[in-house]
From Swiss-Prot:
One of its GO terms (molecular function) is lipase activity. The active site is at S110 (nucleophile), D226 (charge relay system), H256 (charge relay system). Its EC number is 3.1.1.23. This is Monoacylglycerol lipase.
Length: 279
């Protein structure tokens, strides 16, 4: 089965140009996936994911978040999670109009997982299935209370202020993945800015209260050796959601990007199998 990728764009809030890709299989689609990538990266790092989904008969839509990759806006600059969820909602709307009647799957990794979670509790009628990979739903656990308070304040006043350095070697045990990430011109290699820190704290601090609104089937993927987003947040998430069909798939020894680990094919097979059972 052949999957074709096309690039498009739309005007997001504030008239920011949002670039997105669509991966279309050459057969009638079984469902539509709308994907949100993580902090600092871009949609095309998920080309192999979309190709695997395409082989299963799924159309995939994936945007470069504002301030990321090919999209417009100041680099990784945001003040509120709603800026991301609004763009994501626009893309879900496009996918829904272009494939009416198809089930909608929302998929997010890391920061994108936090975005998809926030979107899911706000718009529970806009999707049918949710898949989260190492979701950033407990950012408050990653910093001290003092740093959290500072990030929430600075995120409003100086949202572009770099506040947190990341260890990029922690994304994958595959050295080729790390090298490609470090040399990718579309990837932001700087520190996490205060605005994004504030946005993710918004998600994490409200997660236990808002998670019961998630009632659709949910699959959460997480490597047990993830040093960037520890697995404990995912374990708490699955205990809080309102869905009767929820599964946390823990991958022993895997790092942050389970889709880019040496075991990536098994992870993708697990995702496709889970989705296929529910379509």
């Amino acid at each position: 089965m052949t999957t074709t990728r096309t690039e498009r764009n739309f005007a997001g809030i504030g008239d920011v140009r949002i670039v997105y890709d669509v991966w279309t299989p050459d057969t009638a689609p079984q469902a539509v996936v709308v994907l949100a990538h993580g902090l600092g990266e871009h949609a095309r790092r998920y080309d192999h994911v979309a190709q695997r989904l395409g082989a299963a008969g799924l159309v995939t839509y994936a945007l470069d978040h504002r301030g990321h990759g090919r999209s417009g806006g100041k680099r990784v600059l945001v003040r509120d999670i709603s800026e991301y969820t609004a763009d994501f909602d626009t893309l879900v709307g496009i996918a829904t109009r272009e494939y009416p009647g198809c089930k909608r799957i929302v998929l997010g990794h890391s920061m994108g997982g936090g975005i998809v979670f926030a979107y899911g509790v706000e718009r529970p009628d806009n999707y049918d299935l949710m898949v989260l990979s190492a979701p950033a739903v407990a950012a408050q656990d990653l910093v001290s209370p003092v740093v959290a308070v500072a990030a929430k304040l600075l995120g409003v006043v100086v949202p572009g202020l770099p506040v947190q350095e990341l260890d990029f070697t922690a994304i994958s045990r595959d050295p080729e993945v790390v090298q490609a990430y470090n040399t990718d011109p579309l990837v932001h290699h700087g520190r996490v800015p205060a605005g994004i820190g504030r946005a993710l704290l918004q998600v994490g601090e409200t997660m236990p209260r808002r998670a019961p609104a998630l009632t659709a089937p949910l699959l959460v993927l997480h490597g047990t050796d993830d040093r960037l987003i520890p697995i404990e947040g995912s374990r708490r998430l699955v205990e809080c959601v309102g869905s009767a069909d929820v599964q946390l798939k823990e991958y022993p020894g895997l790092y942050h990007e389970v889709f880019n680990e040496p075991e990536r094919n098994q992870v993708l097979d697990d995702v496709v199998a889970w989705l296929t059972e529910r379509l």
